Amino acid sequence: PYVAPPSRPYRPSGFRGPFSRPLPPPPGWRPRPGIPVVNGVLGLTFGAGIGISLDYLFNNGYTVDGYGNDMIYLRNVPALNYIWTDATLYYGNGGGFDGSSFYYSTPYYDLGRYNAVYNTLVGTYGMPVAVNNGAGTLLSTWYGGNNGFITLRFNAQATVGGSVRYFTTLSFGN
């Protein structure tokens, strides 16, 4: 089944794009003792099927905006003590949940959300394992105790409505 999400002019144009895992941690990297594992989000465990995920989300009050064979679209989703206006949950070739992206945007350059979430992640996971800042993009990557990952990105993106907005994107994956 497929229920297309309604058009929202401020969604990033790539919110339906493919989900990809960052490069693995460097060979010498080891998680610090006690670092949390990254094994899911919103109470969903990586590997869960899309049907089970939809039931869970509907039954727990999440606003499901649409879904397809390999993605679920959500609105106004809590993550890391913030509300994210849009989120996409991604399901791999085997049908299991393997990643998510949470989006927050402003019409102007504003690093407030990025900096606050960055500081939260540093407090929990330590300094990022990888940082790639350049060409108008800030990108930091952390790994959990099980090599699950978190990325935090800030950049300007085209929106579905054709305008350019500044997005903070928080992604979790397996």
Predicted regions located by residue number:
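N-terminal secretory targeting and juxtamembrane "stalk" segments of secreted and cell-surface proteins
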Residues: L23-P25
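Active-site beta-strand termini and strand-to-loop segments that position acidic
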Residues: R75-V77, G92, T141-N147
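Mid-chain, structured segments of secreted extracytoplasmic proteins
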Residues: V77-L111
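Hydrophobic residues embedded in beta-strands of well-ordered beta-sheets
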Residues: D70-I72, G96-D98, L138
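Non-cytosolic coordination micro-motifs
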Residues: P1-R21, R30-Y67, Y104-N174
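Accessory recognition modules or surfaces
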Residues: P33-P36, G40, F46-G47, G68-Y91
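Well-ordered beta-strand positions enriched in small/hydrophobic/aromatic, beta-favoring residues
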Residues: I72, S100, T168-L170
